[in-house]
Amino acid sequence: MQQDKVNLLGLNQKAIEDFFISIGEKKFHARQVFKWIHKKGVIDFDAMTDLGKNLRHKLKEKAQITIPKVVFSKASKDGTHKWLIDVGGSAVETVFIPEEGRGTLCVSSQVGCTLNCSFCSTGKQGFNRNLSAAEVIAQLWIAARTLSKTDGEHDFTVTNIVMMGMGEPLMNFENVVPAMDIMMDDLAYGLSRRKVTLSTSGVVPRIYDLLEQSGVSLAVSLHAPNDMLRNEIVPINKKYNIDELLEACKLYAQKGPHKHITFEYTLMEEVNDNLSDAEELVALLKSREVPAKINLIPFNPYPGTPYKKPSNNRIHRFKEFLQHNGFVTTVRKTRGDDIDAACGQLAGDVMDKTNRKQRYLKKLGDTNAN
């Protein structure tokens, strides 16, 4: 029985070294291949010119470097890029957002999501499966290859990663952490821990694990100033409440790379955007002594949602109150609306479990027909 070939794409440096030792080869050859894949973007063993012929032949027998297919990609007039990537009959989306002096890649970790936050379009798809480490890092590999040129107006260079795409990354810990290891490896993409941010809805035990095993920057999707409201819109709060979450955040801020936690707060009209909500949020964060920056995200409506985007006046009032009380506060700019890439639209068409594959196959067929 033929043994399945190992996909080297998702192996971090230690794992690829272990693989090479298992096939009777030396560690330094593993580092050579690792660098070819991620630093140089080469996935053909025969093109790895510093490897001997016998080693290249052995690798072709025992290993492969498999990149998922891009079903389609779109570029917005504001420079935002979005890719729909085939992951074995389903699809995930990856978004690149260029800004002055930086380029941020938003990476997905699951097909769908397990957490079912009431306002999130991805949650309406239901949950299919976790992505493999190879499927996670492939999103950066694809983006880095695609964005290696400049169009004269935008500088398309990935300088920052945010694990804020489809899915809850801490529910796919075993695959996300090795992928982030590759992102931060100097032989690969060389990003610092400060430049890789994982966003979680509050899987508290895994926050402690993340601090111990990775220590990347942490963002927390808070969205509510009290347990009653958060139980309703972020259901995982029923398992790990705000007190438990903020206790973990306080420790992470003490030992993590930024010495603060970024709290994301999606503003929904007459749900959590009242001045009383802002007052409660300030009191909460001050009483728990969590060093915090706050990123306000105006809700982006999608078909079938009951929630609405607040007026600019309400958004400004909320922001001003937080700033007046000493919190560094930003309002996320809406980007990529013309390609459905803005935050809250990562699911594109809202797909549930029953029609996700049919719509995916239709898009694949339409793409192949063009």
Swiss-Prot record:
A GO molecular-function annotation: tRNA (adenine(37)-C2)-methyltransferase activity
Enzyme Commission identifier(s): 2.1.1.192
Cofactor note text: Binds 1 [4Fe-4S] cluster. The cluster is coordinated with 3 cysteines and an exchangeable S-adenosyl-L-methionine.
Superkingdom of the source species: Bacteria
UniProt keyword 4Fe-4S, yes or no: yes
GO BP term, example: rRNA base methylation
Limits of the Radical SAM core domain: 99-337
Keywords: 4Fe-4S, Cytoplasm, Disulfide bond, Iron, Iron-sulfur, Metal-binding, Methyltransferase, rRNA processing, S-adenosyl-L-methionine, Transferase, tRNA processing
Cited HAMAP family: RNA_methyltr_RlmN
Function: Specifically methylates position 2 of adenine 2503 in 23S rRNA and position 2 of adenine 37 in tRNAs. m2A2503 modification seems to play a crucial role in the proofreading step occurring at the peptidyl transferase center and thus would serve to optimize ribosomal fidelity.
PANTHER family: 23S RRNA METHYLTRANSFERASE, RADICAL SAM CORE DOMAIN-CONTAINING PROTEIN
Additional note from the record: Reaction proceeds by a ping-pong mechanism involving intermediate methylation of a conserved cysteine residue.
Protein name per its UniProtKB record: Dual-specificity RNA methyltransferase RlmN
Natural source organism: Francisella tularensis subsp. novicida (strain U112)
